[in-house]
Every structure is written in C-alpha cells, then in structure tokens.
C-alpha cells in the first residue's frame, strides 16, 4: 500500500525513439495535483485505489476504511507501508481485518506497489497535458488505474516478488 502524486507537473520518463534523434516532449506548467492511494493483492492480482486531494492521517483513514470494505469477508490483509507520517500516526484508525507492516526505512524495493506507480507513470500519466485543472488530474488518475485493472494479469506480474509467498507463509 502506498500513494502517488499525480499532477499537471508530471514526471518525464524514458521512451524508445529513432536512434540519433530526440523526441519532443510536452511539459505542463500547471500545479494542480491529487494523490492516488492504492493497495494491491499480488496473489489474486486485484487492487483498490482512491484518489484524494491530500496526504494526511484523515485521508489515510478514508482509504483504510475503503480497503477494509473491499477485503473479502473472513479474510485478513497485511499491508506493506513505508514510514510516512500518516502511515505511522497514533491517530490512525486501522480496521480489524487489516494489519500494517512497516519495512526498514529507505527500502521501497520491499513494497510491491512501488512498481505499479512506475508502470502507471510510464504508460498513462507522463508526456501529456492535463488541461482542465484539478478535475482533469483526478480523471487521469482514475483512467490510469482502471486501465491497469483492465489488463489481465498485469497487477500480478508487477507485484508478485519471488520472496513474497514464503514471507507471507512464515508470518
């Protein structure tokens, strides 16, 4: 589980292009942004996301409540989170069917969802202009997430780390 900023001042990414030439890229000078909170289940290849205007403990509470409703009855979900302030806040309300796991600091490679953000930016959120302000940013984030979920097996291929099944079975 993690969140990614999506906005008009997007990231530049690498693209394949004709040897010896440089592609022209668009770069927007707007400042509107939103935050895509997302969690994935590598085993089932499913995900849940929520687009929110800010990152805070209140926003995290909203996402955890939404995720808790999406977890099948009788199932418990373990979430790998980084050490962001809103992930470790004492005011955070964690539903009973969720457990938060915090890996060591500065280890994003241990969080499967980090590769999802990279994929979304590479495929749908970079090299484009989001005209229309905040609504366009929210629409782009939702469209990118829905396009990802529409690709059969993509979430599983992005997030199924070889060490993950053994780590889950021993805990």
Regions found by a protein language model. Name each.
Residues 81-83, 101-123, 137:
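RNase H-like two-metal-ion nuclease catalytic core shared by retroviral integrases
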Residues 114-171:
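C-terminal anion-handling pockets and recognition modules
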Residues 22-30, 96-115, 129:
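RNase H-like polynucleotidyl transferase catalytic core
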Residues 74, 93-98:
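Short, well-ordered coil/turn elements that cap or connect secondary structure elements
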Residues 12-13, 91-93:
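Short amphipathic alpha-helical segments
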Residues 58-78:
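Short, basic/hydrophobic alpha-helical segments
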Residues 5-7, 55-56, 77-90, 105-110:
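Acidic, metal-coordinating catalytic cores used for nucleic-acid/nucleotide bond scission
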Residues 1-65, 166-171:
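Extended, low-complexity cationic-aromatic segments
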């Amino acid at each position: 589980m993690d969140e990614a900023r999506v906005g008009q001042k997007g990231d530049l990414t690498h693209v394949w292009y004709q040897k010896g030439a440089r592609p022209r890229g668009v770069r927007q000078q707007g400042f509107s942004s939103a935050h895509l909170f997302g969690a994935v289940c590598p085993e089932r290849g499913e995900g849940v996301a929520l687009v929110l205007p800010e990152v805070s403990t209140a926003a995290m509470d909203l996402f955890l409540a939404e995720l808790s409703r999406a977890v099948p009855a009788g199932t418990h979900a373990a979430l790998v989170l980084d050490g962001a302030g809103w992930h470790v806040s004492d005011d955070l309300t964690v539903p009973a069917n969720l457990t938060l796991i915090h890996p060591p600091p500065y280890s994003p490679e241990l969080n499967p969802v980090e590769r999802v953000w990279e994929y979304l930016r590479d495929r749908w959120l970079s090299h484009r202009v989001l005209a229309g302000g905040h609504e366009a940013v929210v629409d782009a984030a939702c469209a990118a997430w829905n396009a990802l979920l529409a690709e059969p097996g993509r979430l599983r291929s992005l997030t199924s780390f070889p060490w993950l099944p053994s780590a889950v079975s021993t805990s």
